[in-house]
Amino acid sequence: MRRFCRLVCVFALLWLYSPGLVGAQWHPLNPVLSVQRESDGVQLTLQSGALKLQVCSDSIIRVRYSPVAAFPARQEFLVIKDNWPSTKWEMQSTDDTVIVSTAELKVVIARKDSSVTFQDSSGRTLFEQDEVSMTPTVVNGEQTYHAELYSKLWGSYESFYGLGQHQAGVWNYRGEAVDISQDNTNISIPFLLSSNGYGIFWNNSSRSRFNNRFLNALYLSSEVADVLDYYFLYGPEFDKVIGGYRELTGAPPLFGKWAYGFWQCKNKYNTQEELLGVAHKYRQLHIPVDNIVQDWFWWYTMGEPVFDKTRYPDPPGMVEDLHKNNFHLMISFWPYFRPGTKTYEDMDKRGFFIDKTKVGAFHPAQMGLYDAFNPEARKYYWNLMDQALFKIGLDAWWLDTTEPETEDRETNILVTNKTFLGNGARYANMFPLMTTSAVYQGQRSASDKKRVFILSRSAFAGAQRNGAAVWSGDVNSDWVFFKKQIPAGLNYSISGLPYWTTDIGGFVSGNPDDPEYRELFIRWFQFGTFNPLLRVHGTRSTNQNELWSYGSDARKILVSYDTLRYRLLPYIYSMAWMTTSQGYTPMRGLVMDFRTDARTASIGDQFMFGPAFMVNPVTEPGANTRRTYLPKAKWYDFWTGASVEGARSIDAAAPIEKLPIFVRAGSIVPLGPAKEWSTEKPEDPIELRIYRGADGNFTLYEDENDGYNYEKGAHATIQFHWDDAKQSLTIADRQGDFPGMLTERTFQVVFVGENHGTGITPEGKPDKLVHYVGKQIVVTQ
């Protein structure tokens, strides 16, 4: 009997104190007392607090719960759309329920307990909000609430994705828990997507948590809140859900075409002479590259944006030299300022620092972190960059340590200090959004001739609207971490922020003379070729990280993939326009295109690069084959042209020089001429590869390659349609124009087959040559 009692007690304690299960303790029911219809939704008075549903569109519903009757006003930072067009919706009220219906959704609120059930128009349950709670608490001296939502998942087999980039090596978060908190290598975005065809945008900037460790229960919670606030976004396709997120938080602008080329970087170039020498050698060797990067410690002291003259005697001349050689230069800039400089003293006097503390072994005591929440401090920060760097021609901004960097999560500077906006814990995840907005808005106000490009180590919801890409942080240089980058990048991309890259080869260590490390670098570079951005970086034992640093055999392979990247620029740049204008995502987990195929739910090491390419990174040393799942479709081996039917797994050939790549039937892939930088020559002729076996469409996009005239309509598109039944290709009338546009061009049409239209090299015998002058042409096989 005693043993039985002990077991009961142990079970009870485990239930009460298991992480995430505290919210599952019994709470009194919170019935609906009254309902008020408003112009854009309904407000329900509850026994405890109030619940409000706002109909934003047919597929987007905002849900808010307040512990008091009123909904306090607050300043929005993440969501920038507050004026929604009128949407037709209906409300039905019975003794048991209140139902809000749109053309796509039905939302059922139970009167007995105020639970909320989201259904599609057919009545299929998508998501259930079973309970919400707001628990009074004190955080960083502020009286506030801990917010939590509970959803029961009994009988649901859905998978969960998104939440930003995390390094656990997990793609499908079913059965997992994730801290939504910023730190080096973990980028948190409060946006969750379900294979049931919906997304939840959790509108809170404090440290939060997703917890599904108990498979039949989902908890979403935040440390600081006045109101529990989220948006329910319905697809069911993921592109539509992501499009809804961007409608809320902003669309990503186009980068300059150069940004989609190759980025050469290492830790670090130490002198002007070294940097220019590397750039000149790339041009001498005719290796394609657009961008070179100056990492940290170019300054004479941190926070003072002045080059160390002993190592960089002529910064304007250096930039001019790079531009003459068709390079763009990105430079590292940090949010920390060192005592003892004029800039530090001036910022301190103005109250522009959040805190002054030791934040790491390489930072001196009393380092100041600028207050990116202060609009005047943001202007000041950009002005430093503008006067010292942008005005001499710098092209891109590497914003490092934008979490901001701290010793650990528990001593996060924001959590324990006050900002210009108030309690830092309330805005703990928002620093990267605010600091990228400082640079984006600053450069946009300074010039419209050069598109903003920011590479940030962290991001938050909305950062995509600031022209911000991210890299995956300071990851190790080994196979384990390489493998983890694939699901990390896929989850970041599906979180609505489309531009992601990684330190090819890893950041921490790596010896280019070591044959084993060379293999890792090659495989990582092959993967990186099909990332939204192609970039090498790292700390190498030889201090060499250029493509010729890895030996002649490796160099041949690396340059071949670099060449492929440049041939694919018409395809990649057109995808970038789709991303800006249509809510598209270039790097796509298989579930994005094959959501109803249950076998794709947990495949996080294969992905689609745009509509055509399935990419299958090789993540095991010494591998010569790669187990690959092909969803139901006809697929072509990119290297051989051989076709294979899907809905099965195969062992794809994967010798060191070949990354397994398959192209889906119905794809139309434009490949441009080989070039050494993105704008060396016009995209003419274009080899147009047609992968027969299904109908297909593709739209080629072109503009001036830089500047913001595209926002004013200065761009052109050409639509291609393949009709598989008729075996005919229609090249439509060109739409739009811009200065410098090609008015006449040649399309080399290639109907891909075995050993025809394959690999990197242009097809020597195209099937059709089409002279195009902007008017529709129909091409038959």
Region roles according to the model:
Residues 8-20:
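Bacterial N-terminal signal peptides
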Residues 124-658, 663-664:
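Catalytic-domain carbohydrate-binding cleft regions of carbohydrate-active enzymes
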Residues 23-249, 253-258, 265-267, 274, ...:
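N-terminal accessory segment at the very beginning of proteins
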Residues 1-9:
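Bacterial N-terminal signal peptides that target proteins for export
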